[in-house]
A protein has these predicted regions:
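N-terminal and secondary-structure boundary signal
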Residues: 1-357
């Protein structure tokens, strides 16, 4: 049986990051892999978390998605109207706020330039899927855009850490294709499944490392359950600028210049996690995937290639690609309080981030 393949592009960035660093890297790796949609319309699902600013490190950079659009339109001959960018917002988000979130994250400008549609996945309903062999989620609502066999669904997460899952990669990004939105509150659902509905336990001040890892284990099962219900056609992680910390407004941005891509989502997450500094030995998410027979047991079970200038070359050592320093997660638990000073904190409502749609 052949091994799954994962592809890495590492862009050398000497100066200040520019939009073209994101755009050109995305297009280059797709050209090298020769990704084809086989005539299907394309739907890309980036991580556009709560409309965070385009250069915050929190969202998949819009210029990276713009590079993917260029690949399908300019290299594959798709009409821009057949290439979609989708995300699902909270059920409490008004249409005006939804538009502002797209605008603040840079996607409105990108979509206008590339002439591609932005879609709210929740507006199109779902398909209920009962995949079997699930642990926490058994009847899962999946966006019609992700479930439709006539759509080429591309999962486009950001290379960053997360205060619960530890990493935010392909598996976590798939929460955004869970419809209706009320069913994707997995952090709180995992809390209740792990600790019960004990209203006396609020926040994380009481939480030890073992408690947090138990919570991680529950949400990891949920993410793998969603994977069994919906496997993306292709996965590509934007790590041109990575981010550690708590996934949101406490963290550090790293110019890593990395893109990690492949057809097999679990293998992409194994490799991306390793480049951040996490392995199957120290990441509960991957441990659960291995235990369930979904993830490769060892990174050696994956064929990993570098992509540069259209050339595909087998990688013998991942050391030159691994982040230095490695990514540090901030879990908001007492064990992590001593390292809070490592991270920068900024206000998402600062005046410099306020723009109109």
């Amino acid at each position: 049986m052949s091994k799954p393949e994962v592809y890495i592009l590492k862009r050398n960035i000497a100066g200040v990051l520019e939009d073209r660093d994101f755009e050109e890297s995305a297009r280059e790796i797709m050209q090298g892999i020769h990704v084809q949609s086989d005539g299907r319309d394309v739907m890309m699902k980036p991580n556009v978390a709560a409309g965070a600013p385009r250069n915050s490190g929190i969202v998949t950079h819009p210029s990276f998605v713009g590079g993917l659009v260029d690949y399908f339109v300019k290299d594959c001959g798709h009409s821009p109207s057949d290439v979609y960018v989708g995300e699902a917002s909270s059920r409490n988000t008004s249409p005006a706020q939804r538009d502002l979130d797209w605008a603040r994250s840079g996607y409105t400008e990108m979509a206008r330039e590339k002439r591609v549609p932005l879609i709210e996945l929740a507006d199109y309903g779902n398909v209920r899927i009962t995949p079997g062999n699930t642990v926490q989620l058994h009847n899962i609502g999946i966006s019609r855009w992700a479930a439709d066999d006539h759509i080429f669904y591309i999962n486009v997460p950001k290379l960053k850490t997360h205060n619960l899952g530890v990493v935010t990669l392909c598996g976590k990004n798939q929460q955004g294709v869970m419809i209706p939105v009320v069913e994707r509150h997995l952090c709180s659902d995992a809390w209740n499944a792990t600790f019960g509905r004990d209203t006396k336990r609020q926040g994380r001040e009481w939480m030890g490392v073992e408690d947090h890892e138990a919570w991680q284990r529950t949400i990891a099962h949920m993410h793998w359950d969603v994977y069994l219900a919906c496997q993306p056609d292709f996965n590509i992680v934007e790590g041109i600028m990575g981010r550690d910390g708590n996934a949101f407004y406490l963290g550090r941005n790293f110019t890593t210049g990395l893109v990690i891509a492949g057809y097999h989502m679990p293998s992409v997450d194994v490799v991306a996690s390793y480049l951040m500094g996490y392995t199957i030995d120290n990441l509960v998410y991957l441990q659960v995937g291995v235990e369930r027979g979904i993830c490769p047991e060892h990174i050696e079970d994956i064929d990993i290639f570098s992509m540069m200038d259209g050339d595909k070359k087998k990688i013998d050592s991942l050391s030159p690609y691994r982040a230095d320093p490695t990514f540090e997660v901030y879990r908001d638990i007492p064990a992590d309080y001593p390292k809070k000073s490592l991270f920068d904190e900024y206000d998402p409502n600062a005046e410099t981030f306020q723009i109109s749609a």
